[in-house]
Every structure is written in C-alpha cells, then in structure tokens.
C-alpha cells in the first residue's frame, strides 16, 4: 500500500543489516530473522537499502536479491516497508528505482547523485526523472549530512512543491531555527531525523526516525519512542552519554557510521551478526563490540533487557 506522508511514515523504522557468509556475500536468511525481530519489537516500519544496509557496496544482482527477499518477508509480517534504491550515479539510481517499484513497496528511498554537487535546478530535474522511473510509487529523499549536496530547508520546500510524489525526507535534523524553517513542510511530508535525537526531534516537529538505536535494540528503541516528556528526554541524555563513550571514539578514528550501526547490532545480540563489512570497507573489531556492550550496560541497561523481554 502506498505511503502518503506523515500519517503513514512516523515512529521507529528499522533497517535490515547484511550478515555475511564465508564468501563475504550477504546471507539472505538474515533478512527473514531481522524482519521477524522488528515485527516482534513493534517497529512502525522497515526499510532496506540505506547506508547501514551497505547499499553502496552491493552489486546490482545483490541489490535485486536483497530487495526481493526483503519485500517478501516484510509483506509476510504485515509491516509497512520502503526499499532504498540509492546509487552514487544518476543513471544507476534510475535502474534501481525501476526495479524497486516492481516489488510494490510503500515508498522508495533515493539519494542525490554523489560525484559532484548539484544546484537546486539540477536536484529538481533529477528528482523529476526519478519520479518517472518510480511510476507513481511515493518517494523518500535520503539526504544525510555526508552527502555531496546537502539541502537547506528552503531547498526542500521548493523540491516538495515541484514533486507531488515526494512523501518524506531522511536528514540530519537541526536546531530550533532549522525546525522553524522546516515548518511549511512538516504537515506535508514526513521528516525523519537521527535515531539518537528521537525525543527532542519529535518534540520540535519531526515525525520519527530511521533508527540507529534500533540497531542496538529494536525493542529498546520502540519503548523509548513510546515514552513522553521528561522521561523520554532523560533517556535521550543517557543515549548521548552512550554515544560519547562508545561510538564517538570509533568515528574519531575514522570508522564510518554504518560500521558503528553494525557493531551496535552485534553488541545488542538481538540478531546473529558480526561487525564485518562488505568489501572494500573495514569494520569494527570484536573489541569495539565488547566496549559498545559495556557502555550500553552502563548507560542503557533497559535497551539490553528489552532484547530478552
């Protein structure tokens, strides 16, 4: 069923992660296990093809196999789902979007071309062609802080005005001023921010998160999302301490964020996975995983307890 915006795309959405077999290829059985775990945890939706899914390392054949398996198991569990069809090259995006729409997802996530930056006119032109390839399937624009073209709120307002099929955006969020600038969009499209900022983001007007905290514990992330007021903000403070203790040191030594996401899943032990990444990336170490679990026990014991509840 197509997703139409804030009413359909809100709360905690969780990503599939690539468990690797002995040949360093994605183990498709892990998709079934992870989606089942997300359904048990009460996640609001699931998605594939984000950075944490290592889409930038997948061959086109792997992308198709993963997307098809994911769509089938998400449908089996009755979870709303989106398929990420990101590609660093514009024509590559069109090919992946054309395939993704055949799987009838609620929406397709796309990124902007990433070799050189685009101006606003170029972004609109690109998104218009993507919309044609999607053939009526709603679109979610994934515009992370590390993208070559990071869009300002005023740009997003213009793009949404020009593209009726745009129903959501995944972005880095911002301060109160950023949310004020985003106000014209907040009733029109779903705005998702980083998972560890969930409580403050929701308070300021965001609709939810494609959650990195669900990598540590899907049930923990959902439980936090259902809290309100001071309780939710207090937990967010402890999440910030956890991130500073466990994740920032990994980022500071050059590990990418998606390596941290996978290491968090290994530490959370809600799914069987190692921190190893697909070629050519180097993942976190087993020592990193142990340190993440230790930090979670210290700062977020309820996240680890939720795994076994």
PLM segments and residue spans:
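A general structural signal for well-ordered alpha-helical segments in protein cores
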Residues: 63, 67, 93, 127, ...
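Active-site beta->alpha loop and helix N-cap motifs at the rims of alpha/beta catalytic domains
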Residues: 2-149, 158
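Solvent-exposed, flexible loop/coil residues
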Residues: 21-24, 59, 155, 262, ...
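Catalytic alpha/beta core domains of metabolic enzymes, predominantly
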Residues: 129-135, 144-254
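C-terminal alpha-helical cap/extension of soluble enzyme domains
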Residues: 8-17, 41-43, 205-207, 217-309
């Amino acid at each position: 069923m197509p997703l139409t915006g804030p009413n359909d795309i809100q709360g905690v959405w969780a990503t599939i992660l690539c468990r690797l077999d002995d040949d360093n290829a994605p183990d498709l059985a892990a998709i079934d296990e992870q989606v089942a775990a997300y359904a048990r945890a009460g996640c609001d939706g699931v998605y594939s093809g984000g950075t944490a899914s290592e889409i930038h390392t997948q061959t086109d054949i792997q992308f198709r196999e993963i997307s098809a398996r994911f769509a089938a198991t998400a449908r089996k569990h009755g979870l709303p789902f989106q398929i990420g069809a990101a590609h660093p090259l514009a024509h590559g995006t069109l090919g992946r979007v054309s395939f993704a729409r055949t799987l009838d997802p609620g929406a397709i996530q796309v990124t902007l071309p990433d070799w050189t930056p685009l101006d606003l006119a170029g972004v609109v032109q690109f998104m218009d062609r993507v919309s044609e390839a999607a053939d009526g399937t709603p679109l979610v624009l994934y515009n992370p802080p590390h993208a070559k073209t990071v869009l300002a709120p005023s740009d997003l307002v213009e793009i949404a005005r020009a593209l009726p099929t745009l129903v959501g955006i995944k972005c880095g969020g911002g301060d109160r001023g950023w949310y004020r600038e985003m106000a014209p969009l907040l009733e029109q499209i779903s705005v998702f921010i980083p998972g560890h900022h969930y409580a403050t983001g929701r308070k300021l007007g965001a609709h939810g998160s494609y959650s990195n905290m669900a990598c540590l514990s899907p049930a923990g992330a959902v439980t936090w999302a259902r809290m309100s007021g001071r309780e939710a903000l207090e937990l967010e403070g402890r999440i910030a301490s956890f991130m500073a203790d466990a994740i920032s040191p990994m980022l500071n030594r050059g590990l990418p964020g998606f390596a941290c996401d996978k290491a968090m899943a290994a530490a959370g032990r809600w799914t069987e996975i190692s921190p190893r990444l697909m070629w050519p990336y180097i993942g976190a170490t087993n020592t990193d995983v142990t340190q993440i679990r230790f930090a979670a026990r210290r700062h977020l014991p309820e996240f680890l307890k939720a795994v076994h509840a």
